[in-house]
């Protein structure tokens, strides 16, 4: 059986083997355009500020635990037994503010952090529970649309949340962030499917004549004629020797190389398109915050606009994306399973099986360990930098918003340019990620230069507000590369047919890690009274993933992934990929 026949043969009943269309790719890009604004504009800028501001409007100064932080309300009496002084009718714009929750004192800034941590926990549970339904049957697209609409509506509802019910704002933040994370896991699970059925890969599996090139998106050559691989596009999976012309077909290793490059290209375009949308809405949001009064209402209005953007642009994405069903999940009687309880049980059992078989996926384990630390560093640097700029460089909200715009513009440039940079310097995918890590390391190291007296005397080492702008550009450039390359690189290590489950693990690793970094930075700040000493921790956190990435072997990881996928599907190791025997079941039956 030829490779072409293998690719076109359905792997299970209902398998959609149609080539990926431009309309389908447009739908995938469109959802990135729709939802990326939430994580960039809402989570990265205005949602934490809104939560803190609403809590501040109901809080009191930490210094005396009585003076209101806002002039719009009179606080209740302190809890019994408190030694706080009698209420004084004055308002302070500065100082630390606290709220009382279940009798405990909570800093208004911590309120947003606790909300985010709780949303990460809920998000992890939801992602794991729905991964079975996303991998099997026709639920992948349906779940993406449901989570998108619920999350966008929850974001729009901030318009009616007033400081008096700021806890409702926390609940809406948990719902919206959870739905965003779940929907993006589902979106990521489409990526390997779109790549697998892309027309350029189907063409590449046929014999390539010496005068013809197989081209990828926008006419860029993916590889030269058979036996003469384009050395500017060599990556981890490219064989040392060109494919045998006598074999009459492209080698499997070359196909892996093409898949990796195509996946990286599509992922980069998706990230870049999402950043472009985020830049546009971020500029609009800054104008709204500057023009509209009072400040709390302007922030809520911005969140409404973010939710509206997410909602509106999800509609064309829902129309253009194909369902792309996964293999049916069977009950103990061999019939398709329709119970949501059964799907959830299966999802958690699958996670357990995946963890127990982790020793067979050595490269995924190494990569996820590196990604755990790296994603924690990404999230922690972002939050720490904003807090540092506000508290120690005394930068105003408009200036902080401008930093975010610069970060996004650099991110767009990075998402589109890193593939060309890696080709120019002949870098493999893993080497490109390592280059991004090295550049990322420069940010905390530059902050640590501020401890050196000679550097302090010339006003460098993050002692002046203008220094935040070039560092923001560097951060955005690195993020554009890491976001696209890490996502597509991980996709090549996933067992075929289990995209949603493994991308759920990717998302859990990504989001779950961000609980620890901010907490440690907070503890260091409490210990030393300033944020700068935390740059030592950040430098270590960013450096450790570098040697781990050097250990990842994409060829070995791909082989292990295919072997594990065959084992999970119950396919004999000697059978041809894509063939369906009469007595083959797609999954181990489970009790409903």
Swiss-Prot record:
Regions that span the bilayer: 31-51, 108-128, 143-163, 167-187, 271-291, 301-321, 364-384, 398-418, 433-453, 468-490, 502-524, 534-554
Superkingdom of source: Eukaryota
An annotated GO cellular component: vacuolar membrane
Membrane topology: Multi-pass membrane protein
Subcellular location: Vacuole membrane
InterPro entries, sorted: Atg22 (IPR044738), Atg22-like (IPR024671), ATG22/LtaA_families (IPR050495), MFS_trans_sf (IPR036259)
Region (Disordered): 572-592
Keyword Transmembrane helix set for record: yes
Intrachain disulfide bonds: none
Alphabetical keyword list: Amino-acid transport, Autophagy, Glycoprotein, Membrane, Transmembrane, Transmembrane helix, Transport, Vacuole
Function: Vacuolar effluxer which mediate the efflux of amino acids resulting from autophagic degradation. The release of autophagic amino acids allows the maintenance of protein synthesis and viability during nitrogen starvation.
PANTHER family reported for this sequence: AUTOPHAGY-RELATED PROTEIN 22
Family in the record: Belongs to the ATG22 family.
Name the record gives this protein: Autophagy-related protein 22-1
Organism this protein belongs to: Penicillium rubens (strain ATCC 28089 / DSM 1075 / NRRL 1951 / Wisconsin 54-1255)
